[in-house]
Amino acid sequence: MDWEKLGLKMGLEIHQQLNTKHKLFCPCKTELVDEDYNEIVERNLRPTQSELGEIDRAALQESLRGLNFKYESYDHHTCLVESDDEPPHSLNKEALEICITIAALMNMHIVDEFHTMRKQVIDGSNTGGFQRTGLAATDGYLDTPYGRVAIESLGLEEDAARRIETTEDYTEFRLDRLGIPLAEITTDPSMHHPDQVREVAYMIGQVLRSTNVKRGLGTIRQDLNISIEKGARVEIKGVQNLDLMSEIVENEVQRQLALIEIKEELNKRNAEVLEEIHDLDSLFENTKSKILSSAESIKAVVLKGFNGLIGKEVQPGRRFGTEIASYAKKRGVSGIFHSDELPAYGITQDEVNSVKDYLNVGSQDAFIIVAHDENVAISALEEVKRRANLGFEGVVEETRKSLDDGNTEYMRPLPTANRMYLETDIPLFKITDELVEPIKNNLPELPDVKKERIIKEYNLSEDLASQLVKRLEADVFEEILTDVEVDPTPVASLLAYDLREIKREGLDIDILTTRHLKDIFQLLADSKIAKDSVTKLTTCVIQSPDEEIEITAKNNNLTLLSHEEVTQIIEDIVNKNEAMVKERQMGAMGPLMGMSMKELKGKADGSIVNRIVKESIQKML
C-alpha cells in the first residue's frame, strides 16, 4: 500500500503500571491477588454531565446496556477508597517521581502543578463511575530512525479494576488492580508507516523499563490511534504484541478502505435502512434451526440496497456483517443472521425465500434476523439499524479492541472531552525545582545503552547481556563484580538463567541477598569451588541461608580437591582404561572425561579436568 497517498496517520497511547509501594490514593498494596475475596460490593452506574453540561457519548452508550456491577474486595489489597466509600488519600509522591523521571528521559516539559481530574468511565471498571487522572508533563520528543516523534503528554492515573466475569445480568470485577498508579504516554499522530509505530512503541518501552515500573503480562497496555485521509480516527485498545502492530495497522487500513467502498456503493444504490422491526415467529414455527427454535422471539429488519455488501470482507475473515454484529452484541445477543450468509445455521433456502416474500425484499435488498428474548431482540435490532445507517458515513470514530489475529472488534464510540471534570477531594500538588532537579541529575541508563556497555566492558555475549537487562539483574551483576574479581560469565549465567531454573524447582530465590551471591562468587574467585558447582551451592544456600557460605559448600561436598588429588584420581581412571586408550588414542578423551567428572562430582573445575585427562592420555601413548 502507498501509505503516504492514503494519508495514513498514527499515534500511540501507552499505559504502564508503576512499581510503587502502595496505590495512587490509598495505602493498599499494588500486587494482584488470586484467592477467595472477603466481600462483594454492588453498584449501578450512570453518566453525569461535564463542567460544560454535556454527556460523553461513550459513557452514555455504556449506560444503555443497563448492567449491574459486582466487585470483589480483599483485606490489605483493597479498602474503602476502592469501593468509593471513603475520600481518596494524598497523592502518591513516589508515583509522581517516577513520572518525572519518564518525562525527563523523553525531553518533556514538567508541569508546575499536578491537578487531579475525574474522567467518566461507566463500563464498571471503576466503582465511582470515574477514573482519577492528572497531567504530569507535555511537549516532549523521541528521536527515532524514522525521524523525531512528538510526545504530547504524560499523565498519571489510576488503573482500573480487573474484569472477572460477564453474564447477561451483571459484570464482576476484582478491586485489587483498581488504584495501582499508571503512567499514560501519548504521542502526536505524526507516524505514517506501520513499521514506524512499532519502532516508537519499542523505544517508549525502553524508556519505561529503565525506570521503576512493573513487569510482566498485563502491566503495560498499548493503544493505537489510526486514520486515513477519507476515513476517521479509530482507537485500537490493548495491543500487547509489538510484532503484531504492523499487521494491525494494515488490517485497520484495509477495513477503512472497505467501509469507504461500501459507503460509495450504498449512496450509488440510494440505499435505505427501514425503521420497522418485523416479527418472524410464525415463519419459523417448524424450523430445524436449533438457534431459532430455542429463541423466545425472532425479529428482523430490512436494509434496502444492502444486498452483497453485508457479506463484503472488511478485514481478513471478517465482514461488514461482523461489524454490525459487534454493535448488536452490546445489547446482549450472541450474534445476528444476515441474508448474505443464508441459507446456513440450519436455516433452509425455503425459509430464506419465505422471509424475503414476507418482508417484500427486492434483489438488491438485504435483511438481518435476531433471535432472543423479545426486548433484547428489539434492542439489538435498534443497534443493527444504527450501525447500518453509519454505513452511509463510511468510517466512524470508535474505540476497537485488538484481537490476537491482527484484526480488531468494536467496543464503544470514541470518547469525547465531555467526560472530564475536576476532582474536588484532592488538593493540587506543587512540583518544585527541589523535587525535579535531583531526579534530572540522576537519570537511569536506557536498557539498550546498558546492554551495549555491559557487552563491551565485561566481554559477555549479546544473549547473556540482553537477559541480564531484561530480567533487571544488570545492577546486581555489576555490584558483584565491583567487589569480587571473578570471571563475569558464570555470574551472568547464574543471574540470567540458573536462578530461573532454581525457581522452577520450587525454591524461593527471593531469600538470596546480594551478600550471599558475592560470597558464593568469592569462593569461585579463590578457587575453592568449581564453576560447575555454583548453581548447586546457590540451591544449598537458599535452603540454609543463615549458614556461612564456605561451611555450606563443605557440608555439601562442593569444595574443590587439591591439584594433586585431582591428578591422582584421573590417572587412576586412565590406567584402568589402558586398553581403550591404546585402541582409540586421543579418541578416548570423551569417555575418560565423562568418567572423571562423574568420579570427581564437581570437586574440580571442568577445564582443569580436561587438561589433566589430555596430559594423562598423552603420557600413556
Swiss-Prot record:
It catalyses: L-glutamyl-tRNA(Gln) + L-glutamine + ATP + H2O = L-glutaminyl-tRNA(Gln) + L-glutamate + ADP + phosphate + H(+). GO terms for biological process: glutaminyl-tRNAGln biosynthesis via transamidation; translation. Allows the formation of correctly charged Gln-tRNA(Gln) through the transamidation of misacylated Glu-tRNA(Gln) in organisms which lack glutaminyl-tRNA synthetase. The reaction takes place in the presence of glutamine and ATP through an activated gamma-phospho-Glu-tRNA(Gln). The GatDE system is specific for glutamate and does not act on aspartate. Belongs to the GatB/GatE family. GatE subfamily. NCBIfam families: gatE_arch, PRK04028.1. Keywords: ATP-binding, Ligase, Nucleotide-binding, Protein biosynthesis. SMART domains: GatB_Yqey. The keyword Protein transport does not apply. The keyword Ion transport does not apply. PANTHER family: GLUTAMYL-TRNA GLN AMIDOTRANSFERASE SUBUNIT B MITOCHONDRIAL AND PROKARYOTIC PET112-RELATED (PTHR11659), GLUTAMYL-TRNA(GLN) AMIDOTRANSFERASE SUBUNIT E (PTHR11659:SF2). GO terms for cellular component: cytoplasm. This is Glutamyl-tRNA(Gln) amidotransferase subunit E. One of its GO terms (molecular function) is aminoacyl-tRNA ligase activity. Heterodimer of GatD and GatE. Its EC number is 6.3.5.-. InterPro entries: Asn/Gln-tRNA_amidoTrfase_suB/E, Asn/Gln-tRNA_Trfase_suB/E_cat, Asn/Gln_amidotransferase, Asn/Gln_tRNA_amidoTrase-B-like, GAD-like_sf, GAD_dom, GatB_C_1, GatB_Yqey_C_2.
